[in-house]
Amino acid sequence: SVFFPAEKETSGLRFHLHAPFVPELSRASIKETAANLPLFSQLAALTVASLHQIRDLGLLTGEFLAVLPNPQDAIPPRYQAIHKAIVEAMNEEPLTPTHSKSHAPARRLLQAKASLKDLLSSPDDIRLLNTTDYTAHPHRLSLNCDGWAVGASQKNSNQDRFLSGLAIREWNVENFLQLIESPMME
């Protein structure tokens, strides 16, 4: 097999993809043909499988998230399946980095300022607050909460934009005040 870089092909991704695509005659880009369509879905599945390996190697960190596509990236339609698969996997599988240096599904994480995370960081704090259904009582941590998501090192960075595109729930000081003033705490 021979490798030809598709110099005019723009994926909008911040990582390289290699597959046996049918190229244009000039070999400068990938041809719009039905033969290439299955490769994009296979690359999406491979990318998600790779995230599990990256996590297991200890490399799926907050900083790594800056490499992944975020909602503000200009990604051509045929590459959207890769972005969608990554977001779905991060939301549903234990792949999202947490404040406590572990991984959890993004749907089961909360985001807050670092000072609030540090205040309520022990497993006992999370268990104490983890007693109510979040949808019925949004100011409380929920029964299905695994703790705090990792925070972005800089606002409006690729890392921050990626985290904002996940199903992580925001939790703030007002939520905390409502929690400690609630009848449950009496």
Would you name each region that the model predicts?
Residues 1-186:
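GHKL/Bergerat-fold ATPase module
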